[in-house]
Structure formats: C-alpha cells, structure tokens
Regions:
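Histidine-centered metal-chelating micro-motifs
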Residues: 46-48, 67, 83, 87-92
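Ligand-binding loop in jelly-roll beta-barrel domains
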Residues: 87-112
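Conserved short histidine dyad/triad with adjacent acidic residue
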Residues: 37-52
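A short, N-terminal "cap"/entry segment at the start of jelly-roll beta-barrel domains
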Residues: 1-34, 48, 115-118
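Short, charged/polar surface micro-motifs in flexible loops or helix N-caps
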Residues: 29-32, 42-45, 65-67, 108-111
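Structural motif
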Residues: 65-67, 74, 90, 99
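Short acidic-glycine-tyrosine-enriched beta hairpin
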Residues: 73-87
C-alpha cells in the first residue's frame, strides 16, 4: 500500500509555468499508468498554452476561480468543477482575482517531455 501526504511533497515548476506538488507519480510511488498532483497559480497567473501528445488530463478545481481554454473554447470554472483535457488538445488555465488550486490527474503520467508549446 502506498500513501503519500501532500504536505510531504516538494513543490516544483512545470514546463507550463504552474507550481506542482506531485502526490503520486513515477518519482515517489510504484505508479505506471497515471499521476496525481496539486497545481497552483497566483491571482491573475496563467499556464503557458500547450498540449500533451500522450497524456489525457483531468483537472478538479479545489480553490479559486479561473478561465479554462481548450482548443479555443473558454469557460469559467470554480470549486467543484471537473475538467477533461483530451490528449492533443491545446489548453491554458488562467486564475482570476484570487489564486487557483487544482488537482491534476494525467494518464499516462505527466512528463515534461510530453509538453508542447506554440
């Protein structure tokens, strides 16, 4: 059994610019097919627009509000919203006036090498 505490995970900045604490991934658990992380953005902050060739992502908004853009379509998101980002879809999330905290699940697991920019 593997149980990892969020508080024990060291934050790092991903290629898209968000601050991540990886809860379960290949670096800290016997994970093969997915990863789970907390991502944060400061008020007004945004990820760089990007896509992943291999990974499908789920975002789940924990705190804050944001504008989610996927392949040119924009929607407002808030706590309790789940977002599907298909593999190959261009996407960007922009925090509104307060900071943003989300859970992010990637399958296959997140990799810097699978992040592509405009």
């Amino acid at each position: 059994m593997t149980i990892n505490s969020l508080d024990a995970q060291k934050p790092f900045t991903t290629a898209d610019g968000s601050t991540i604490r990886s809860i379960l991934d290949r670096t800290n658990a016997p994970v093969e097919k997915q990863s789970l992380a907390e991502a944060t953005l400061p008020a007004g902050g945004a990820t760089e627009r990007h896509y992943h060739k291999l990974s499908e992502e789920f975002y789940f908004v924990l705190e804050g509000t944001a504008v989610m853009e996927i392949d040119g379509e924009e929607k407002n998101v808030s706590p309790g919203d789940g977002i599907l980002i298909p593999a190959g879809a261009w996407h960007q999330i922009t925090a509104k006036s307060e900071g943003l905290r989300i859970l992010c699940c990637c399958a296959p697991p997140y990799s810097h090498d699978d992040t592509y920019f405009e």
